[in-house]
């Protein structure tokens, strides 16, 4: 009789590949077969629960159409100042309409980095390429000069003037 504490071996039956393939080609085909984990990922992405019209980011739509290997090669690209400005304008437009989308603060990165009373144009100038606020004394706006007898009557606006082709304010 066999001992009970010996490890049991599980044998799998592997369906034979086409008989006309040589063993090297058969091995390459076997290696290219997806693992169960990638099958779960691809089946989740092709499921009808994901509605492309509900996905706000067009970059994400194109990413869903890619294979897992192509998605793995892609790197995250930080947005340019123009793209950042467009995101902020879009976000402010939605706030004015009263439609605050879920996760909007995380996507633009301006919600938490802007202290009250600072216009959004100054937030953009403070944002670095990583999307985090730079803490420098020169970036803090002065509402009125010390010792000045007249306080500033200009209120901070939420309007962001458009940039000209060189990236400077056209105002």
UniProtKB/Swiss-Prot annotation:
Q: Known post-translational modifications?
A: Phosphorylation of Thr-35 is required for activity.
Q: Name one GO molecular function term.
A: protein serine/threonine phosphatase inhibitor activity
Q: Which GO terms describe its cellular component?
A: cytoplasm
Keywords carried by this UniProt record? Acetylation, Carbohydrate metabolism, Glycogen metabolism, Phosphoprotein, Protein phosphatase inhibitor
Q: Where is this region: Disordered?
A: 1-171
Q: Which InterPro entries match?
A: PPP1R1A/B/C (IPR008466)
Region annotated Interaction with PPP1R15A sits at 143-171
Question: What residue spans carry the Basic and acidic residues bias annotation?
Answer: 19-29, 135-157
Name a biological process GO annotation.
Answer: glycogen metabolic process
> Which parts of the sequence are annotated with region: Essential for activity?
9-12, 42-54
Ligase keyword on record = no
Q: Which residues carry this modification: Phosphothreonine?
A: 35
Q: Which residues carry this modification: Phosphoserine?
A: 43, 46-47, 67
User: N-acetylmethionine (modified residue): where?
Assistant: 1
Q: Which family does it belong to?
A: Belongs to the protein phosphatase inhibitor 1 family.
Q: What does this protein do?
A: Inhibitor of protein-phosphatase 1. This protein may be important in hormonal control of glycogen metabolism. Does not inhibit type-2 phosphatases.
Q: Which PANTHER family match?
A: PROTEIN PHOSPHATASE 1 REGULATORY SUBUNIT 1A, PROTEIN PHOSPHATASE INHIBITOR AND DOPAMINE- AND CAMP-REGULATED NEURONAL PHOSPHOPROTEIN
Give the multimer and partner information: Interacts with PPP1R15A.
The entry's protein name is Protein phosphatase 1 regulatory subunit 1A
Native species = Homo sapiens (Human)
